[in-house]
Amino acid sequence: MENFKCRVSSVQNRALKMYGSRFMFDVNEETCWSSDQGSPQWVELQSKDGERKISSFSIQFQGGFAGKDCFFEVKSSNSLDIISTPFYPDDVNTLQHFSLQTPVTGNTFIFKFTTSTDFFGRIVIYKLVVNE
């Protein structure tokens, strides 16, 4: 994921060294991004190399802290339009794969979690992968 710049809505207790966004992309199965409480939460990936064509993505949540009412949004530098596709993750610990009906092209990709399975609105992600 070195070809993307990542921003997130929040980090638990602002503890970037423990729960920062970079931990979604490392190979360590014990590290994660953990949001602060409150809804909505989001993860934004911005391509460093211009437009990208995305066909699918994978997310591994921590059970009990998964997204609900989720949307994958795509913005292009060539258009003001935002493509928004809902996706429906299960509240489990395993890596979940989501294929798009039609591949989308853009330079900014946003995973929006309108609500969470956690009562306080927290999201915990161990792994996030976008596939071209």
How should each PLM-predicted stretch be described?
Residues 3, 13, 36-41, 64-132:
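Trp- and acidic/polar-enriched beta-sheet ligand-binding modules for extracellular glycan
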Residues 40, 49-56, 106-107:
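Extended extracellular/luminal ectodomain segments enriched in beta-structured repeat modules
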